[in-house]
A protein has these predicted regions:
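Sequence signature of WD/YWTD-type beta-propeller architectures
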Residues: 1-228
């Protein structure tokens, strides 16, 4: 396992090749979340990253909250966390760590807006649904066959479908989805900014880079960038 790393309020990360990090001011080292990460394998031999989360209180005592999470997001209060463990989404409080609350089962990944009013759930089949705060049921399926998604700070969820050499990039706001571009190689979210890469012409390894501050209107910023 790695050394303990600080995870402040609204810190979010997911293991694997796609990793999104949203780190805000963590404040004191006490009354804060920390995590370790380590490599794991599923029954088919696929390698991925898992996380153990701890809360260090003002008395300098470390309490383990979660073991074996594949994705987590620290809630704005900095004392509770949303996490995916064994394909289910839980919320765990530092003040009651032995009683995690099940939010939803059959969850591969999730994205939540800053106030956790809207939580987008992707199941193990790649279907995306919305769980609104206080709602007893999930929305209907918004998008299908999604392989990767990431949330922007403005509450826009970006998604890409299953692909080999290029997929369809879409955005979701509420229960409405919008196709942004086709044949997209990959995309990343950096908090307030998103970028995606699209193959440039017939040459291998060269991509045009498009960027956006709202997750819907993208502008070509770099042509024929070499990505190794």
């Amino acid at each position: 396992a790695s050394a303990l790393s600080l995870a402040g309020a609204q810190y979010s990360t997911m293991g694997g090749s796609e990793c999104t990090v949203l780190l805000k001011n963590a404040g004191s080292l006490f009354n804060s979340m920390f995590y370790t990460e380590y490599n794991a394998k599923d029954s088919d031999g696929n390698q991925f990253v898992e996380y153990d989360l701890y809360f260090v209180n003002s008395s300098k005592k470390a309490v383990k909250l979660v073991g074996g999470a594949t994705q987590f997001t620290v809630q704005p209060d900095g004392t509770s966390v949303y996490c995916v463990v064994d394909s289910s989404l839980y919320t765990v409080s530092a003040f009651n760590p032995k009683k995690p609350e099940l939010v939803e089962s059959n969850v591969y990944a999730f994205g939540a807006d800053e106030g956790f009013k809207n939580v987008y759930l992707t199941d193990i089949y790649g279907n995306v649904r919305l769980k609104k705060d206080g709602a007893s049921k999930l929305s209907d399926i918004i998008l299908m066959n999604i392989s990767h998604s990431a949330m922007m700070n403005n509450g826009t969820l970006l998604c890409i479908g299953l692909y080999d050499n290029g997929g369809t990039l879409c955005s979701i706001k509420g229960t409405e989805s919008k196709i942004l571009d086709e044949n997209v190689y990959y995309f990343e979210v950096y908090g307030d900014v998103a970028a995606y890469y699209k193959k440039a012409g017939s040459k291998d390894g060269l991509y045009d880079v498009y960027m956006s501050e709202d997750g819907e209107n993208f502008t070509l910023c770099v042509e024929q960038a070499a990505i190794g």
